[in-house]
Swiss-Prot record:
Protein name (record): Diaminopimelate epimerase
Active site as annotated: C75, C216
Marked site (Could be important to modulate the pK values of the two catalytic cysteine residues) residue numbers: H158, E207
Metabolic or biological pathway, per its Swiss-Prot or TrEMBL entry: Amino-acid biosynthesis; L-lysine biosynthesis via DAP pathway; DL-2,6-diaminopimelate from LL-2,6-diaminopimelate: step 1/1
Gene Ontology biological process terms from the UniProt entry: lysine biosynthetic process via diaminopimelate
Gene3D superfamilies: Diaminopimelate Epimerase, Chain A, domain 1 (3.10.310.10)
InterPro entries xref list: DAP_epimerase_AS, DAP_epimerase_DapF
UniProt binding sites for substrate: N15, Q48, N66, G76, N77, N156, N189, E207, R208, G217, S218
Top EC class, one word: isomerase
Subunit structure: Homodimer.
Gene name linked to the record: dapF
Organism: Acidiphilium cryptum (strain JF-5)
Catalytic reactions of this protein: (2S,6S)-2,6-diaminopimelate = meso-2,6-diaminopimelate
Homology family: Belongs to the diaminopimelate epimerase family.
Key words of the record: Amino-acid biosynthesis, Cytoplasm, Isomerase, Lysine biosynthesis
Amino acid sequence: MAAARPFLKMHGAGNDFVVLDARAHPLDLAPAAAARIADRHRGVGCDQIILIERDDGAAAFMRILNADGSESGACGNATRCVAALLAGETGARRLTIRTNAGLLPAEIKGPTLVEVDMGAPKLGWEDIPLAEPADTLSLRLALGPVQNPAACSMGNPHATFFVDDLTHLQIETIGPKLEHARLFPERANIGFARIDAPDRIRLRVWERGAGLTLACGSGACAALVNAHRRGLAARRAEIEMDGGTLTLTWRDDGHVLMEGPVALVFEGELDAAMLAP
């Protein structure tokens, strides 16, 4: 049985994480253990579990496990949190973190403010991926009051529905059905965006493997990209989510920059039973 391990509870704009440092002592966390830790009633509770691992070509490798135990390629809010931790160790203002989605450069902007270069979105249907060829600017997909989302990949698949009313939208009902739609062979993160101004977007996200979260960094990136592609938003906008606001910039070179807050909530220890497969 695995030994007890220290952890940090962190969040970025309310998107919360259990962070485990596995650089000195590697940890092979089974999906069942990840789901146990993420349980908000019987575990610590979080949207994702983050494992910080050694990497010879970057400051660290960041492994991301969703609340259901599945693995994710990218998480912008978690990247900011890990960047802040690593910068605190070394004093570096700029560093690069490797994820399954690639290398993500980060810059410390303030004591609790971090910017991450999330890379360039992938817009081809096969890159998201979709189950069949389709125009990713307007998918033939509808459920209840929402229809025809735009899709892209920010290291993980995203579909963004543009709506006029977020208040009465039953996201807990339609979110899981859209996540598992046949069009998305790897499932998808589902965003619901209301355009308040060309530089202001209100967003709620049903995250693949995590459900409705207070914030989703890659979802915010996808919302800006898809809104700009539709002619609904500028290349720079404030993305307001339930847990806070992120500042997004889609640069002319194609890269998306995401700036937002990070916070350390508390420290603790996971016992061996919690870590067991």
